[in-house]
């Protein structure tokens, strides 16, 4: 039997990544070792942004997380995502040296690569290893989120990645539309979650909705403002990082409306208790083709915390008794009332099936079924 290694390239810092529980499940269900390739350190970006810990971790070398799970912070001259072909040839040599410190005879292995950014197959081809590619598409990367316009650079990388990959995992059915020539190797996976132990003393915020996660320009500010204004009887709580281009908006609604409060940034470990605090989780995104293809992880995480959600219509989820869709202020208002008055029945078949089919354990099995 051919020896195999899983190589997972993270799209976010490992400790804060939405999918780190998935990667842990993959390692537990695999016979060989799994190497997590964290966001790289380099001479320029890491130092310019004050990310000195990245350089330190790259120098320290790989870290064993479990028996067969290894976290590697690679070191590059310049991050591969923004490097030209010449620089990336050197970057590839540096990466291969780092991998060989973990597995000396890595040339004898088949490497199954799970990755999230279309640049990686072309880059990893430079390693000259026995590599199979598995592409996980999170959003409609061919479009920009805030205005839905085509992004030519990402479109080019995405097409190359789709062509080179042995299998392609999709966040939603909508992502099939621009990739129909690859139907034979497409599978809709979506986000997952895990059951958590919650603090017993989580204090509920009565008559409340929560906007949780990265507060960015995906939000339909006009719709949300009118909803806040219409529902003065509802407490609107924001939890998460505020991106710079949303700071002015947040300052405005916090100053203007007494029913709005910002609770600050919280760690990934703390966020699950915040899902429990609110009656409903709100996803008031802009409505365009990009957004329609999304599957926000906050929805599945909130359902696992037994808190229902109301969102704009998206193809990443099916509407049900605890996930409601709304397009207008009136519809959002109505669905909030419905969900506050109709709590999730955690004993129902509908809920239990959702938990089973959306667990990270189940998602890991779906992915590994396609690894050759």
What are these regions (language model features)?
Residues 174, 189-195, 201, 278:
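Carbohydrate-associated surface elements
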Residues 202-219, 224-228, 236-239:
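Conserved donor-binding/catalytic core segment of Leloir-type glycosyltransferases
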Residues 164-186, 314:
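A short, active-site helix/loop in glycosyltransferases that binds the activated sugar's phosphate group
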Residues 269-274, 281-303, 311-321:
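Nucleotide-sugar-dependent
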Residues 240, 248-272:
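Nucleotide-activated donor-binding/catalytic signature segment of Leloir-type glycosyltransferases, i.e.
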Residues 342-372:
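A charged, aromatic-enriched C-terminal amphipathic alpha-helix characteristic of glycosyltransferases
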Residues 97-104, 140, 148-168:
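Membrane-proximal helix-turn-helix segments that form the acceptor-binding/catalytic region
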